[in-house]
Amino acid sequence: MKLRIFEIVFAAMMIASIGGATAAGAQSSPAREPVAPDSGPKTLLEGILGSTEKDKGKEGSDGEEHLDADRPHFPEATTTVGKGRAILESGYTFTKKGDSFLSHTVPEALLRVGMFADWFEFRIGQDTLHQRQTVEEVTATANGAKDLYLGVKLALTEQKGWLPATVVIPQMTVPTGSAEVTAGRVLPGVNVDFGWEVIKDVFNIELLVANNFVQDELGNSRHELATGLTGAFQLTKKLELFAEWDAFYPTAGASPASRHYAVAGAVYFVTPNLQLDMRAGVGLNHNSNDFLAGVGFAARY
């Protein structure tokens, strides 16, 4: 009988020892961090040259960042939306020059869709124009849909030190607009955007160099070089303030003089996938409009 009791006690002690060792081992072993799924190269250069293991380890380490919309800055974002994601942007802009010029543009709709790879983005946009212009006491109006915008954005490089993040946007408008507004022809162009994160999560610099054919005041097409330089300050995780200098340099056509604007605004991130924006600006020379203002939003899906 005593032997039987001893065997039972011994067996219980062995079971308890094994269970304790297992629990201790589980507690001492560090929990494995979830491995981020491989979403492929973020830029075209990375897709060609490949990424390092160090770069891969950085992916997915933080929570989802807020969307990087093209609006309301004149320079576009130096990121693409990502494969399988989409961003819809929309807004309204009011422009005025004394009593001689007044325009409203709405909805400034731009749909950006990530396709094929994280570095490739398809873009389609539509807008309407309501404009009144007086020249030598003769007033003309133009109202209706503008030409359809089509383009792609290619993320070329991410920032490496002082080398900027870079994207290129081949684009065009096709003559689908109303009779009073359409250019009546395809107008091609290409934008190149550069971005520097100077102080992480605090201060960014953006630069746009745009070469596009546009419609002039006489309805003819002309080449125009445009530049935009923006400084963006992230005051909090939800609030960004920015200031920029935008310039337009026609190379021919009815208005060969340049136009310059100083613009400032704010972006409020309601959620990581929704932002609201507002901006206002003034013309810096005689050829520019006196004042512009606008509001808008962007949503990521």
Regions found by a protein language model. Give the residues of each.
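Absolute N-terminal positional cue centered near the fourth residue
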Residues: 4, 16-17, 29
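Bacterial N-terminal signal peptides that target proteins for export
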Residues: 1-10
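C-terminal segment of classical bacterial N-terminal signal peptides
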Residues: 15-23
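Transmembrane beta-barrel domains of Gram-negative outer membranes and organellar outer membranes
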Residues: 27-301
